[in-house]
Design a protein with these regions (language model features):
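Jelly-roll (double-stranded beta-helix
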Residues: 1-30, 41-46, 50-52, 57, ...
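Short amphipathic
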Residues: 32-36
């Protein structure tokens, strides 16, 4: 579990996250993170949070958010909320860095997902092209964290079925949905 103040980095996407509030510090109410994004940073693939609302507050720079067929350019001081279950994508395609505070409500296990995903990247276990782990690792993580992350409607259901089918194979091949080495050794 992440601790307040812990910072993790994804060397391929150029994202840096500092945990401002965690599941433990808020009794599960929210996960609050400061994202630092380099110019023209990797744009997150379309996804949804089946049981979480996501909020973005731009501290500096700007980001692009797409959801429900609409696109917003959010500048410094702007805030955007994406309702639970809504497919969306977001990132920094611009020429300047961006700092964004992201909240997920409730927290669920999203911090463990981020610790695992960024830890895999730090250890060179993701694609240098797109920053994603192997198909089996990704399928296992999507299945394990299906309350936190899913493909956007209408792709979410087939993706969830495929992840469920591939998860036993991934485990048999030695993949895990979380690795203790990526989590804070002192706990919450």
């Amino acid at each position: 579990m992440a601790k307040v103040g812990k910072t993790i980095e994804h060397p391929v996407t150029g994202e840096r996250i500092t945990f401002l509030e965690t599941a433990a510090s808020t009794d599960g109410t929210l996960l609050k993170m400061a994202f630092e994004m380099r110019p023209r940073a990797f744009i997150a693939g379309a996804h949804a949070h089946p049981r979480q609302e996501e909020r973005f507050a731009v501290g500096s720079g700007r980001i692009r958010v797409k959801t429900g067929g609409r696109e917003w350019i959010a500048d410094e001081g702007d805030e955007i909320s994406v309702p639970r279950g809504a497919g969306h994508t977001w990132g920094n395609p611009f020429d300047e860095p961006a700092q964004v505070v992201v909240e997920l409500r409730p927290a669920l296990r999203a911090e463990t997902y981020f610790e695992t995903y960024f830890g895999l990247a730090r250890d060179g276990r993701v694609s240098a092209r797109n920053g994603l782990p192997s198909l089996l690792q990704f399928a296992l993580m999507l299945h394990e964290y299906r309350d936190e992350f899913a493909g956007p409607p209408p792709l979410g259901a087939p993706g969830a079925v495929l992840a469920a089918i591939l998860s036993p194979l991934a485990r048999a091949r030695g993949y895990r949905a979380r690795y203790g080495t990526y989590e804070d050794p002192d706990g919450p």
